[in-house]
């Protein structure tokens, strides 16, 4: 331990033991405990207690809980556990009966402060820290602590109850350690005392009539099989699987969700022989006994298993498909997917749930659609995948939601009334519909998909969220439609669809709802990014009013919409699709957009549009946009001037990224779009051209990055440091580095560095020649600064000495004015 910390420790222990002192808040105590953990990892806990008697005095004082505050009680219980984690220190503490006085049945559980959850939680955590060696196991078995943990499983505090269950699993695993590798696992009756006690308690709880007790037992088993992958878990399952199986004989089945979690946890175990232990039969029985809404998560979990019999996979997949099969049967004359609706009890139960109430119907359909959507993206996705039937079901659900379905039965009519206008189901169906775009579908169904999407996008009844989902699904079907994988062009059917879509998109761009305008702009941006270079798409877009409306939204009153409009305008301009009159004014219109974006960057009151402008400008610079190439120096200078005054740190970071792109093009590998590298050889020269260094001195780039080194926002300073390191590596010769004072303009260099060191980084550097700029780059310890910036912002104040000093400094502060120094 640090000598200064040793000097401060007695005073701090005295303060903690004094209930009249309102010491620190919980955060400081947590940091103090973390520090003690670090110390005990490097030193002997026993030696630490012997060298610092004040610690033993504090811990002994806790045996009089009426004289200690609850938060200090909780801290002390955990601290004792940290010390007792080392076996020699455990025995030392046990001799003085400190451990029994704190963790025994007559200890903390008998205190008045035991009613406070944080004290109970501290007691559990203290036990968890010390339970790391055989001596601790004997103590736990003899002290009554395990019995207290059993009662805490039902604690009203969920955190305490969960911690108690986790600790029981930890104790069980610790008890079973120590067997010789390869030796046979003894029967459960021959297990250590602690292990037997826990297993017997779990067994009794599984036979209990009260559901909470059953749930507690199942949770312990689930955690055990999830964490412990040793052979003894097979003996444990052999012992407890019969009472688990008998839970299915009850009506209703208790703790269904906990029971499903257990079965899946056991099924993932790498050490069990599933065929021998009857797990597959138990899973099959469970799938058939549960209601459709209960069986869905278990069916999905079963299908995710690596080694699962095909028969069980088929059963689980059938459970997931059944609700959609019922939808198809209720709305069409076709029987739906073969073999899924055969008059079984399961299918009748599904129909009953779909028709029982709106909440039950909506819940089952949303769960089913989400599970199937997740399943399609997994490697364990069933094959063959019933693409056609699932697509028909998704479209049918959307028809039911918009009221256009033509039911063939009374059940279908009731479904129309239940699902009509249901936004939640519409959203789930559109998500699933988008996922189905990855499969191969017949042309007539693809055309129906486009028709349903058009209707949804056009309907005045569609909510903003439904429209957003419809735009996303539309994009996915356009990106991956029924075409050859090598083709990136839009199909003729997709182009016809776009011809009908653009008038609808025009209306949505004029929507009074800002969320709709925003979604429409995002959709347009994606469209242009993917197909802006295709002639047919360009013609269809130009023949609409969409580009004009998108540019008008640069003046939208909502900042999110302005930001999306900036992105759309940037894409339109990059592809030469911006709205403009005939050719004479085309160049002026293009320049007009550039100035509009510059105006937004300089004057917009919200950060989102300004950030969007910087992203567009960075892309334009990287891609060699015509307006940027026309006068790159003016462009970069104007942008950086505006960015240097911006109060938004994300704008400043993006400005530094733009500067990095500029330097990379000019100093890095030559680029086709870089005006400074035209005609240069492919290999980079060891020193940049003097004219470019003069350009750098004229630009505010170096000054902007130099001042940003001490930006109050760390990401900005880090980005600036990286930029200057890149600039130095590309410009300063590797050999014969010169000091700042060797520069021809050493006075100005020293003055600039002095101002920077004194914190006047906002002051302009003044006129610098290239040699002065290079001298500053040589003089700065950029690597050291980069290392300091990589540390957390409180790395100086996080020292243990600072922590102890601050905790002592807070003594006497009123509780309502407590301050966390960290």
UniProtKB/Swiss-Prot annotation:
Single GO molecular function: ribonuclease inhibitor activity
UniProt modification remark: Ubiquitinated by NEDD4, NEDD4L and ITCH; mono- and polyubiquitinated forms are detected.
SUPFAM superfamilies linked to this entry: ARM repeat (SSF48371)
UniProt-listed InterPro entries: ARM-like (IPR011989), ARM-type_fold (IPR016024), BRAT1 (IPR038904), HEAT (IPR000357)
Keywords (A to Z) from UniProt: Cytoplasm, DNA damage, Metal-binding, Nucleus, Phosphoprotein, Repeat, Ubl conjugation, Zinc
Pfam families found in the cross-reference section: HEAT (PF02985)
Record motif BRAT1-like motif, residues: 820-822
Listed GO biological process terms: apoptotic process; cell migration; cell population proliferation; DNA damage response; glucose metabolic process; integrator complex assembly; mitochondrion localization; positive regulation of cell growth
Principal location: nucleus
Organism ancestry: Eukaryota, Metazoa, Chordata, Craniata, Vertebrata
Top-level taxon in the UniProt lineage: Eukaryota
Residues that, per the record, bind Zn(2+): 821
Function: Component of a multiprotein complex required for the assembly of the RNA endonuclease module of the integrator complex. Associates with INTS9 and INTS11 in the cytoplasm and blocks the active site of INTS11 to inhibit the endonuclease activity of INTS11 before formation of the full integrator complex. Following dissociation of WDR73 of the complex, BRAT1 facilitates the nuclear import of the INTS9-INTS11 heterodimer. In the nucleus, INTS4 is integrated to the INTS9-INTS11 heterodimer and BRAT1 is released from the mature RNA endonuclease module by inositol hexakisphosphate (InsP6).
Subunit record text: Part of the multiprotein complex composed of BRAT1, WDR73, as well as integrator complex subunits INTS9 and INTS11. Interacts with BRCA1 and ATM. Interacts with MTOR and RPTOR. Interacts with NDFIP1. Interacts with SMC1A and PRKDC.
Tissue-specific expression: High levels detected in the cortex and much lower levels detected in the cerebellum, spinal cord and lung (at protein level).
Organism listed in the record: Mus musculus
Gene Ontology cellular component annotations, sorted alphabetically: cytoplasm; cytosol; nucleoplasm; nucleus
Cellular compartments annotated: Nucleus; Cytoplasm
Phosphoserine PTM sites in chain numbering: 743
Notes concerning its domains: The BRAT1-like motif mediates inhibition of the endonuclease activity of INTS11 by forming hyrogen bond and hydrophobic interactions with the active site of INTS11: Cys-821 coordinates one of the two active site zinc ions of INTS11.
Region (Required for interaction with NDFIP1) location: 100-200
Protein name (database record): Integrator complex assembly factor BRAT1
